């Protein structure tokens, strides 16, 4: 499954707003599709466990990079949050801005490690090693 989608929307000189918005929608659509595919794989697992997993999108617009996370909210809605935003340094004088970019990557890394733990739990629930409690993922697929 695609856990991270990366999209570069504009060049360094000027922003093309329409293109940036279309890319934002594309990231959301890809993330939702990835999560839907995962619901089919873990349909007998707990919905509460599944709500903890997300798909990530990185969008670069001019000199700004943004990390977003998309998760299931309920049967009919998804939620998307901006997790981190950083400015990309262009000159040596701006070099300290690289710390923001590294924090963004660190945040993504921690999130992906957490996602591996959740995937393990979902697998245990799927094969009934750990009995899921509450509604199952398949309840939102009907």
Language-model-derived ranges and their functions:
Residues 1-142:
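Extended catalytic cores and adjacent scaffolds of nucleotide/polyanion-binding enzymes
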């Amino acid at each position: 499954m695609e856990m991270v989608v990366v999209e570069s929307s504009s060049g360094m000189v000027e922003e093309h707003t329409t293109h940036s918005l279309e890319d934002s929608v594309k990231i959301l659509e890809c993330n939702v599709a990835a999560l839907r595919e995962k619901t089919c794989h873990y349909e007998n697992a707990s919905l509460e466990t599944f709500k903890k997993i997300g798909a990530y999108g990185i969008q670069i617009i001019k000199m700004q990079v943004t990390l977003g996370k998309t998760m299931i909210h309920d049967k009919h809605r998804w939620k998307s949050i901006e997790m981190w935003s950083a400015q990309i340094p262009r000159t040596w004088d701006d070099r300290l801005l690289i710390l923001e970019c590294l924090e963004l990557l660190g945040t993504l890394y921690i999130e992906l490690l957490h996602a591996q733990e959740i995937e393990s739990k979902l697998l245990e629930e799927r094969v009934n090693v750990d009995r899921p409690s509450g509604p199952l993922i398949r309840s939102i697929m009907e």
